[in-house]
């Protein structure tokens, strides 16, 4: 049961973490451009 449950927990986690990192890096890039 644990092996079946692990991917179903991992997929939404990656689906939320990856866009969050992408948005954070984009935000930092915009902030850097505004300061310069």
Curated annotation (Swiss-Prot):
InterPro entries: PSI_PsaI (IPR001302), PSI_PsaI_sf (IPR036357). SUPFAM superfamilies: Subunit VIII of photosystem I reaction centre, PsaI. Its main location: plastid. The chain crosses the membrane at residues 8-28. The keyword Chloroplast applies. Keywords: Chloroplast, Membrane, Photosynthesis, Photosystem I, Plastid, Thylakoid, Transmembrane, Transmembrane helix. It comes from the Eukaryota. One of its GO terms (cellular component) is chloroplast thylakoid membrane. The keyword tRNA processing does not apply. It is a single-pass membrane protein. Coiled coil: none annotated. GO terms for biological process: photosynthesis. It is found in: Plastid, Chloroplast thylakoid membrane. Belongs to the PsaI family. HAMAP family: PSI_PsaI (MF_00431). May help in the organization of the PsaL subunit. PANTHER family: PHOTOSYSTEM I REACTION CENTER SUBUNIT VIII, PTHR35775. This is Photosystem I reaction center subunit VIII. It comes from Helianthus annuus (Common sunflower).
């Amino acid at each position: 049961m644990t092996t079946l449950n692990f991917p179903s927990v991992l997929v939404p986690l990656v689906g939320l973490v990856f866009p969050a990192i992408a948005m954070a890096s984009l935000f930092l890039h915009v902030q850097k451009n505004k300061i310069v």
